[in-house]
């Protein structure tokens, strides 16, 4: 079973507004679920956008750090979501956070090459625009230098409904689809292996 972007938004909204399950709880469930899938590895580069996909990435980073793993956190983007900001304040108490603010990716590339796993938590299913040169170059750097790449929910740069690439997208070994596999993920091989992560979205029996 797959789901559209709009249906996923509808289910999330219902879970939060009708059933009063805070988005931070869903984010925690997503991050914890992916943590349990990858905690057999020892070293990680986690690249987070400033939206809720990046918030999921910060939750993953926190649990990896608390379990004794080597974790380097990079943040990219402009406007922060409320949930991202809350998780950023937590992670700053546990480790140094590095910011990618121009097209000099040397520090990021060094981290990616040294660490076993690269976690793509830049863009989620809400992306619906062409990527600018900066983000295309960032994704190229990840694809070229990553040893083993996983995506949080969807590879950054991919349309959730069509699988279209908005210039390019992260080429993943594994994509951990949060709650449901998105329609577009079956239409683009850059997702790699697809696995679903249960987070407690409320749905009715006929959905």
Q: Over which residues does each language-model region extend?
A:
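Generic secondary-structure signature for well-ordered alpha-helical cores
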Residues: 13-17, 32, 39-40, 96, ...
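S-adenosylmethionine-dependent methyltransferases
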Residues: 28-33, 47, 71-74, 195-201
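Nucleotide and nucleotide-moiety/phosphate-recognizing core
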Residues: 35-122, 130-152
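Catalytic cores of large soluble enzymes that bind and process phosphate-bearing ligands
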Residues: 3, 19, 26, 30, ...
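Positively charged, low-complexity intrinsically disordered leader regions
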Residues: 1-41, 203-207
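YjeF_N-associated NAD(P)HX repair module
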Residues: 2-4, 115-207
């Amino acid at each position: 079973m797959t789901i559209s972007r709009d249906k996923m938004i509808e289910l999330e909204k219902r879970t939060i507004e009708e059933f009063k399950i805070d988005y931070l709880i869903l984010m925690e469930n997503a991050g914890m679920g992916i943590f349990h899938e990858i905690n057999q590895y020892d070293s990680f580069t986690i690249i987070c956008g400033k939206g809720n996909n990046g918030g999921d990435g910060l939750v993953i980073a926190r649990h990896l750090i608390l379990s004794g793993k080597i974790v380097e956190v990079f943040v990219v983007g402009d406007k922060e979501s409320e949930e991202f900001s809350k998780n950023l304040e937590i992670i700053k108490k546990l480790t140094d956070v590095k910011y990618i603010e121009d097209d000099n990716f040397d520090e990021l590339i060094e981290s990616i090459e040294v660490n076993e796993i690269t976690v793509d938590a830049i863009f989620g299913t809400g992306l619906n625009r062409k990527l600018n040169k900066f983000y295309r170059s960032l994704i190229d750097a990840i694809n070229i230098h990553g040893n083993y790449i996983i995506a949080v929910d969807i590879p950054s740069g991919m349309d959730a409904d069509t699988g279209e690439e908005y210039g390019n997208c992260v080429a993943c070994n594994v994509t951990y689809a949060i709650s449901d596999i998105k329609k577009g993920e079956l239409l683009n091989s850059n997702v790699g292996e697809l696995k679903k992560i249960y987070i407690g979205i409320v749905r009715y029996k006929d959905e």
